[in-house]
Amino acid sequence: GLVQYVMGRLPQNEVIEDAIRKEVKLVPEVVIRELLANALIHQDFELTGTSPMVEVYADRVEISNPGEPIVPVDRFIDGYQSRNERLADLMRRFGICEEKSSGIDRVIEAAEFLQLPAPDFLVEHQRTVAVIYGAKDFKLMDRSDRVRACYQHCVLQWVLRRKMTNQTL
């Protein structure tokens, strides 16, 4: 399907684990799946001449959909409001996505687990854009990357009812 099509176009690296060569994609499949589902569910069908879009670059993937979000981008982790509730319900029934308000949480958890830079969520020209970055050395991350990672980690811990400490960060 669509997820496999996008995964097949992502840049990849080879790593050696336990003496076995393994191909690693720029970003994990769970991230692509959740962001594609969000782009489809939350698009504004009233805007004409535009549709969800996936752009693949050497260092990042940008998945966008038409329309400005109903919830501010800094509340994507803990807020939920869909403009297409019937479509969201249908996609949950078909197993394309899970319960409400869990997709962005999964994206951020996957990025943290794999030590990827924190995803960025933007609103540009009546489009909502999710940017997920490939691996980046901590020394090369700028201040905004680090602040975004701290903020998202803090909110995610709160949503999951976990304590945030220096060790969890």
What does each of the following model-derived ranges do?
Residues 1-168:
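C-terminal regulatory or interaction extensions
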